[in-house]
A protein has these predicted regions:
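Conserved, well-structured core domains of diverse proteins
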Residues: 1-3, 65-158, 162-254, 260-261
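N-terminal cysteine/histidine-rich coordination modules
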Residues: 2-15, 34-36, 42-45
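Cysteine-cluster motifs in flexible loop/terminal segments that predominantly coordinate metals
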Residues: 13, 19-28, 56-59, 376-377
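Iron-sulfur cluster-binding cysteine motifs and their immediate structural context
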Residues: 23-46, 58-76
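Glycine-rich, proline-tolerant flexible connector loops at the mouths of alpha/beta enzymes
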Residues: 44-47, 192, 196-201, 252-256, ...
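Glycine-rich phosphate/ribose-binding loops and adjacent secondary-structure elements
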Residues: 61, 283-400
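Hydrophobic, small-residue-rich alpha-helical packing segments that form membrane-like cores
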Residues: 231, 239, 244, 249-285, ...
């Protein structure tokens, strides 16, 4: 793919009609208004002048074999902003279908993130470690030590966030459970119900009788309680080691969950309690929670259902971190997860994922301040979610 001008022009010779039969097709030559293509004496089409390509993609639209690709040689934000290809394609999609773009994953584009933060090291003014090998570091985190009979102790201050069965395959869910068991951390069911093997896999056992631990030291399973109540029962709530109340998430704050019907197989339908092939749509809020007092009652209800044995967590999206975290803490939960705009999802309107919420790094300081103002920052644990990609991101989040 030669790159000379602002745009890269590539032709897939394996599918190009002209490449297979010279002289048979020259649509790109005919429709390009800028002379990018030419046809030689043998009837073969070639890219003649890359510099004249303006990225209109008329050639790609008219190519009968869909063999042409036009991509920016530099960021679209420099070459085409604000009318990027993505913006144009979205307008076409809305015009043709009358609907919005629905996609997975998370936000894309230049948002403030952990890359813009650096770590200040120790030197003369503060004590430095002996070296990275011998310095002792206490990383255990206990959740629910003051309120639950069976608090959970994470070996490291990280966990796998909620990703539901359906958005992820059965194999992926069990792989996360085994990973949690091997590292001594927690994994989360998400709002789609629990895979039958998930609870004992997360605890490190390969069989439901839990006779012999296979994956040491063993981890934990957090059961998510969401607005859709998918697969919810007393047995479900007690299947794990902690319960998380889902209020929102980073990739689609202000909205409920959405699992596309194409992903709802017989097995997933059985777990969620819905018809095969139907979209699973969770409400944006709890219809039985109409006030702050109702929220406190929900926390108390879950403590009662779990016989006061399990910690209760709450997951928030990126809205008003200070006020939201303060209310969650006052409702009596043991830990609060706050998910920034860089978090992921299985399905969400593109316009919401791209344009609603606040960055993860902007969620953490006001959330910490809310707990400190209540005098609960040593009691209620704060969990930062959303685009934490590696150990350095995790370290920066902890430092904040």
């Amino acid at each position: 793919m030669p790159v000379i001008g602002t745009f890269c022009v590539s032709v897939d010779k394996d599918v190009c009609v002209n490449a297979q039969s010279p002289g048979k097709c020259a649509t790109c030559v005919e429709v390009c208004p800028y002379g990018v293509y030419e046809i030689d004496a043998q009837g073969q089409v070639h890219v003649n002048n890359y510099n004249t390509c303006v990225g209109c993609r008329i050639c790609a639209e008219f190519c009968p074999a869909n063999a042409i690709r036009i991509n920016p040689a530099e960021s679209e934000y420099l070459s085409r902003y604000p009318w990027t290809f993505g913006q144009i394609e979205e307008i076409h999609h809305k015009s043709l279908t009358g609907g919005y773009l629905l996609r997975g994953f998370g936000t894309a584009g230049p948002l403030p993130h952990f890359d813009g933060i650096v770590v200040v090291p120790s030197q003369l003014a503060s004590e430095s470690p002996r070296d990275k090998y011998r310095e002792e570091c206490q990383m255990e985190v206990v959740i629910g030590e003051d309120t639950a009979e069976e608090p959970i102790t994470l070996r490291y201050p990280i966990l796998f966030p909620a990703m539901s069965y359906g958005a992820l395959s059965r194999e992926a869910k069990l792989a996360l459970a085994i990973g949690a068991a091997k590292t001594g951390i927690a994994t989360n069911t998400g709002e789609g119900g629990v895979v039958p093997e998930e609870p004992y896999y997360a605890n490190g056992y390969a069989d439901p009788e839990r006779k012999e631990q296979k994956w040491a030291p063993g981890g934990y399973l957090v059961i998510q309680w969401s607005t859709g109540r998918w697969g919810v029962s007393a047995d479900y709530v007690n299947a794990g080691d902690a319960v998380e109340i889902k209020i929102g998430q980073g990739a689609k704050p202000g909205m409920g969950g959405h699992l596309l019907g194409a992903k709802v197989t017989e097995e997933i339908a059985a777990v969620r309690g819905i018809p095969v092939g139907s979209d699973a749509l969770s409400p944006c809020r709890y219809y039985d929670v109409l006030s702050f007092e109702d929220m406190k009652k929900m926390v108390a209800f879950l403590r009662d259902v779990t016989d006061y044995k399990k910690p209760i967590l709450m997951k928030l999206g990126p809205s008003r971190p200070y006020d939201d975290v303060r209310m969650a803490a006052e409702a009596g939960v043991d830990a609060i997860s706050i998910d920034g705009i860089c978090g992921g999802t299985g399905a969400s309107p593109d316009v919401v994922t791209q344009g609603v919420g606040i960055p993860t790094i902007a969620c953490i300081p006001p959330a910490v301040r809310a707990l400190k103002d209540l005098g609960l920052h040593r009691k209620v644990k704060l969990i930062a979610l959303g685009g934490i990609r590696n150990g350095l991101d995790a370290f920066k989040a902890l430092a904040m």
